């Protein structure tokens, strides 16, 4: 199993649940099998979209990207600019992103 060296965790907060649901639906249009293959070759190990549910009246998703290393991160940024950004730029959101280096990991 290949382990992640670098992780990006981003939250996007939407004005309404309707806009959030539109964004969620758009993911299958963005991440087609061909695009996923490009990201995989570039070194992205995993991506996860979560709908946050523990905050009342907050319409927020969490997006996790796991990369093989810093080079993979840099390469995947250009792919995100090519495939992802053009498809989501019309959404008005508050975006907070964080990059982390894996220090400790548990998996079963």
Predicted feature residues:
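Glycine-rich beta-strand-turn "strand-cap" elements at beta-sheet edges
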Residues: 1-4, 40-62, 85-108
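Generic alpha-helical secondary structure signal
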Residues: 13, 27, 35, 43, ...
């Amino acid at each position: 199993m290949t382990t992640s060296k670098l992780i990006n965790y981003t939250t996007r907060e939407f004005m309404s649940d309707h806009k959030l649901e539109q964004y969620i639906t758009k993911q299958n249009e963005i991440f087609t099998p061909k695009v996923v293959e490009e990201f995989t070759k570039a070194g992205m190990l995993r991506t996860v979209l979560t709908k946050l549910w523990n905050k009342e009246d907050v319409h927020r998703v969490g997006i996790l990207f796991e990369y093989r290393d810093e080079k993979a991160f840099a390469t995947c940024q250009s792919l995100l600019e090519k495939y992802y950004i053009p498809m989501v730029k019309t959404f008005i959101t508050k975006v907070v992103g964080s990059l982390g280096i894996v220090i400790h990991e548990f998996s079963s």
